[in-house]
């Protein structure tokens, strides 16, 4: 191998080992992930065909630039990533962003699309929602509240699923007590899966074409399948005017791993 080739390989390796930093303080990250009033965005992308025609070193340089940008924004945002390629025909990868202001997410995504890597991204889905305090849980029986607070037994989960939902007009016309009873039945059906399927809800009315974005993580897709079948059998499900379309399925992966995969 000549000196020029060795130097080029050294540069490529050095660029690839740049790591992406997450929020500097764990407490800030925890608050963004758990507090109400936080905006969540799911941005799904495909790589365009021109990306794969680039020489390897050009892809490495482009990926390195994207990593540095993500590091710059990681002090104010929580940025999580998922590999969809091979499991979903909607996108190659997805980013979930939590921010106190949706404009901060917009600034990050706009900056990302302006990088050499971002110019090869084709956005396939943008889903926006807001975290809120539980509307129905305070009215549940004490035993159900206690069960909902049980910690998950499986901390590491490999798969993520995003399902947007739109309710019909009849749902919003129901009085609070009727909706409470329906959601209690919904929750009772979901309780057996609490320890194997992690869930997070985002409210999207007015922010998107949906009313809710449901986010799931699990190690066992068969348990997730059983959960959905159980929820399809409760009365509340009949008020779902739209369930999915798109449904995004992927694996939870560090963004460094995803970017390096696309740099090869």
Give, region by region, the residue ranges found by the protein language model.
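Bacterial N-terminal signal peptides that target proteins for export
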Residues: 1-11
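Short amphipathic alpha-helices in soluble, non-transmembrane regions
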Residues: 107-115, 226-232
